[in-house]
Structure formats: structure tokens, C-alpha cells
From Swiss-Prot:
PROSITE patterns with a match to the protein in the record: UBIA (PS00943)
Full protein name: Protoheme IX farnesyltransferase
Transmembrane segments: 33-53, 54-74, 102-122, 125-145, 154-174, 181-201, 225-245, 246-266, 288-308
Keywords: Cell inner membrane, Cell membrane, Heme biosynthesis, Membrane, Transferase, Transmembrane, Transmembrane helix
Note: Carbon 2 of the heme B porphyrin ring is defined according to the Fischer nomenclature.
SUBUNIT field: Interacts with CtaA.
Gene from which this protein is expressed: ctaB
NCBIfam families assigned to the protein according to its UniProt record, in alphabetical order: cyoE_ctaB, PRK04375.1-2
Pathway where it operates: Porphyrin-containing compound metabolism; heme O biosynthesis; heme O from protoheme: step 1/1
Subcellular localization: Cell inner membrane
Role, per record: Converts heme B (protoheme IX) to heme O by substitution of the vinyl group on carbon 2 of heme B porphyrin ring with a hydroxyethyl farnesyl side group.
Domain of life: Bacteria
Keyword match GTP-binding: no
């Protein structure tokens, strides 16, 4: 983070016209990202082959959500300099001058410690340890290192967003098995095409901020090829998961439809040239990005449906 940019951001925050409200501090937690964390963690917890007391389950999801929010606050603290450059992020609390960087740091560190400690106490130490590692990986490995140094930033860094279902499973069972890692892999392989689609129509933002996204370092043509390759690998993984212990006929039906649409979208992106994209303001790329959000939620929703129906003999493969 450049000192000049950081000091400028700090100066604006120090002279902000209005005191920050609850909504400003809540925005530091990245609530939209937190919703994905909560949902995938919930699916991991419910899909586990054990009975969890509702109160323990609620506490587990709450503290995982707080840990995810803490990661978001620390991410915004560190990225304050580039957030004020990018159009997509310049209205965030710190660059907008509503919250001081030091406040975001204190909030992030405090919530990190609280979430890890309380998750370990409410469920088990292994779950708390995995949450601590996830926060560390997202903040230190991804935000502080990978994001600004390599075009593979979101490929490797995607692991941080893939851990919540694993943590949910461990919170329920106290140990690990193959199934939560299938959910991890699903999220991990989904992350690159999701963010590369965004980078196709937000390339100038990343370029201006000095973030080496694939579109900046290798161009849009190479990014389109990468999206297609990862989408094919993702489809194979998603369809294979249908025949695991967390899959079933409902999941298979959902996966067949979604992956057909996702592959079609990736092929359309791969076939487009820059003139077509510029002409319609990246309409296809924006549509693929929106579809990617639905893609992950519906896959995990299908896993959840299979898990909820399994006790009645209706979920899974019998």
C-alpha cells in the first residue's frame, strides 16, 4: 500500500463531515460476500452426517459469519489505497471518508479474535483453527501478497472463499472427510471464471489500481481462454459431485442444467472479439458474471436439499 495514497485516505477520513454510522461499519464486513460465506458454511454443517443441536448450529454459523466479516474489514483496511482508485470500490467506507483505516483495523482484529475463540468454544478446536487459518490466508496470503503480485491471485487466493463449507462440516463433526473437500473444490474452481468475467469488463479499474489481474497482464483474449478451460474443469467436478455422498438426483438435475448454461456462456465469451464486447458494453460478459453468482448458490442449494430430504429417504441415491 503506497504511503501517499494511504495518507490521503487517512486525511479524508480524519476530516469526514459526518460521524460514521452503524451501516458504515457494517459495510466494512462486506455483507454480500458474508452472505455467501454463511450459506456455504450452513450447507457444510447441514450436510454433515450427524445431528447438531440447533443452538450449537446457530452459534457455529454466527461465528463463521463474524470471521468472514472480520476478513472483509481487514481487506478494506489494507486495500484502502487501491479502493479509492477503482470505480467499483471508491464508495467503500474508508475511501469515502466515513471510517478511518485504524477503525477498520481494530474492528477486523477484534472480530477475528472473537470469532475464532467463540467458534472453538461453541463447537470444537479444529473448527476454530480452520477459521483462524482462513482469516490468515485471506488477509495475509491473498490480500497482502498475492493480489498485488501475480495474475494467479484469485486462482490461489480462491481457497480462502472455499473454506466455509469445510469449517461448517468440521463444526458439526469434529473431523474431516472427503465430502466437505468436494464442496471446497467446487467453490475453488468456480472462483477464477467468476472473477475473470468481472475483470473482462472492469479491466481499466484493475489497471489503474495496479492490480495484476489476468486481463491486465495477459489481455482479454487469454482471459477468455482461461475462463473456458476452468469452466470445463468446473463442470466435470460439479457433475462428478452428483454421485458422491452429498449428491443425488436433485443435485444432478440442477448440475446438468446449470453447467450446460455455464459452458454455453463460457463458449460465447471465448468466441467474442473486442469489437463485439465494446459495441454492447460487455453485455455477454456481464451476463456470465451474474449467472456465476446463481451457479454457486444453486449448486449448494441442491446439496442442502439432498441433505434435508435424506432423513426421510428422499435425498441422495438411496
Amino acid at each position: 500500500m503506497s504511503d501517499a495514497s494511504f495518507n490521503a485516505s487517512t486525511a479524508r477520513a480524519a476530516h469526514r463531515p459526518d460521524e460514521a454510522g452503524f451501516g458504515d461499519y457494517f459495510a466494512l464486513l462486506k455483507p454480500r460476500v458474508m452472505s455467501l460465506v454463511v450459506f456455504t458454511a450452513l450447507v457444510g454443517l447441514v450436510a454433515a452426517p450427524v445431528s447438531v443441536h440447533p443452538f450449537i448450529g446457530f452459534c457455529a454459523i454466527l461465528f463463521i459469519a463474524i470471521g468472514g466479516g472480520a476478513s472483509g474489514a481487514l481487506n478494506m483496511w489494507w486495500d484502502a489505497d487501491i479502493d479509492q482508485v477503482m470505480k467499483r470500490t471508491k464508495k467503500r467506507p474508508i475511501p469515502a471518508g466515513k471510517v478511518e483505516p485504524g477503525e477498520a483495523l481494530a474492528l477486523g482484529l477484534g472480530l477475528s479474535g472473537l470469532s475464532v475463540m467463540m467458534l472453538a468454544l461453541a463447537t470444537n478446536v479444529l473448527a476454530g483453527a480452520f477459521l483462524a487459518f482462513t482469516i490468515f490466508f485471506y488477509v495475509v496470503v491473498y490480500t497482502m501478497w498475492l493480489k498485488r503480485t501475480t495474475p494467479q491471485n484469485i486462482v490461489i487466493g480462491g481457497a480462502a472463499g472455499a473454506f466455509p463449507p469445510v469449517i461448517g462440516w468440521i463444526a458439526a463433526t469434529g473431523d474431516m472427510s472427503v465430502e466437505p473437500w468436494l464442496m471446497f473444490a467446487l467453490t475453488f474452481m468456480w472462483t477464477p471464471p467468476h472473477f475473470w468475467a468481472l475483470a473482462l469488463f472492469m479491466r481499466s479499474d484493475y489497471d489503474d489500481a495496479g492490480v495484476p489481474m489476468l486481463t491486465v497482464t495477459h489481455g482479454r483474449r487469454a482471459t477468455r481462454v482461461h475462463i473456458l478451460i476452468y469452466t470445463i474443469l468446473l463442470a466435470l467436478l460439479a457433475l462428478g459431485t452428483a454421485f458422491s455422498n452429498i449428491g443425488g438426483p436433485i443435485y444432478l438435475a440442477v448440475a446438468l442444467v446449470l453447467n450446460a448454461l455455464f459452458l454455453l456462456g463460457a463458449i460465447r465469451i471465448w468466441r467474442r472479439d473486442e469489437a463485439d464486447s465494446e459495441a454492447d458494453n460487455f453485455k455477454t460478459e456481464r451476463g456470465f458474471f451474474k449467472l456465476s453468482l446463481l451457479y454457486l448458490f444453486l449448486h449448494f442449494g441442491a446439496i442442502l436439499a439432498e441433505a434435508l430430504l435424506r432423513p426421510y429417504g428422499l435425498g441422495g441415491w438411496g
